[in-house]
């Protein structure tokens, strides 16, 4: 199906069909079936996009990459089953004054910012549990207070670790019958809930990277600098993990959107289920809510950009 102007409300698209190429044609971005006989599959106005996510055997034409750089469009690369591989961040997104201020942060200011993020993460974890009818979480409230009174980043990481352990020990209580969660596992995730959590954290990280395009993504305030790791995006994402990522996963399974039989033996989503996931994730990011501080309606996607500012 070819797209029309009204098919999307936001600025992010997902290309999952294997054997396709993303091209540019007369001020529009075109997804073309190069291995089959589908021809033009979709088309979007260039000026309305700022992020394109591609999965597996999807490639970009050289003229399109130049166009993406000119228009400030971020390109994120994933394997076919959603494992993040890398990103192209255009030079146009760099603003010298913003980065100069970022580089000038001293250790005390960095700690204050990091502590605020982790306190927000713990508060949001408690909020999610409360919304799902899970109570007896005063220990999280206490840890949230402790997070704002630490003296070092190592102390803050210790508080975060304690809060995470307490929070995940109660997450199972938010799930409907037929789903269980014992502990957080990664690389590889050992069950279906952990698989969905890992996938959602990757998708959310790339949303945050788009919001932080004017900054140096590799210079964070909490996560240690490591070659190739977008530490600043991981920092900003922390506060949103429970209330956006974990809430999205519980919604998927509790509403029956995703079921156990849609996973492969290695706990990855099947191709059809993955397409469903991408669509639901984008819908979720476009949903609006009343911002707790600004008190006006904003989409989840735009809330990242406000937080980045």
Label every model-predicted segment:
Residues 1-27, 32-35, 43, 95-309:
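Active-site helix-to-loop segments that bind/position phosphate- or nucleotide-bearing substrates
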Residues 23, 30-56, 60-62, 70, ...:
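Internal mixed beta-strand/loop scaffold within catalytic domains of large alpha/beta enzymes
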Residues 48-127:
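A surface-exposed, charged beta-strand/loop segment in the N-terminal or early-internal portion
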């Amino acid at each position: 199906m070819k797209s029309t102007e009204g098919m999307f409300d936001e600025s992010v698209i997902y290309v999952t069909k294997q054997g396709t190429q993303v091209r540019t044609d007369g001020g529009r971005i075109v997804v073309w079936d190069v291995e089959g006989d589908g021809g033009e599959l979709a088309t979007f106005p260039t000026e309305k996009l700022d992020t394109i996510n591609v999965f597996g055997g999807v490639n970009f034409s050289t003229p399109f990459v130049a166009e993406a750089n000119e228009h400030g469009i971020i390109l994120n690369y994933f394997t076919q089953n959603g494992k993040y591989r890398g990103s192209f961040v255009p030079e146009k997104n760099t603003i010298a004054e913003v980065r100069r201020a970022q580089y000038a942060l001293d250790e005390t200011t960095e700690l204050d910012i990091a502590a605020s993020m982790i306190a927000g993460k713990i508060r949001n974890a408690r909020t999610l549990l409360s919304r799902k009818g899970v109570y007896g979480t005063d220990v999280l409230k206490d840890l949230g207070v402790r997070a704002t009174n630490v003296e070092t980043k190592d102390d803050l990481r210790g508080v975060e670790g304690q809060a995470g352990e307490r929070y995940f020990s109660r997450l199972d209580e938010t799930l409907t019958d037929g789903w269980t969660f014992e502990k957080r596992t990664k690389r590889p995730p050992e069950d279906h809930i952990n698989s969905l959590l890992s996938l959602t954290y990757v998708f959310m990280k790339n949303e945050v990277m788009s919001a932080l395009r004017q900054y140096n993504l590799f210079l964070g305030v909490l996560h240690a600098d490591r070659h190739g790791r977008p530490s600043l995006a991981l920092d900003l994402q922390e506060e949103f993990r429970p209330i956006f990522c974990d809430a999205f996963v519980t919604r998927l399974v509790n509403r029956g959107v995703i079921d156990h039989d849609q996973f492969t033996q290695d706990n990855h989503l099947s191709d059809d289920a993955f397409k469903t996931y991408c669509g639901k994730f984008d819908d979720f990011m476009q949903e609006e809510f009343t911002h707790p501080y600004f008190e006006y309606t904003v989409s989840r996607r735009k809330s990242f950009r406000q937080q980045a500012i």
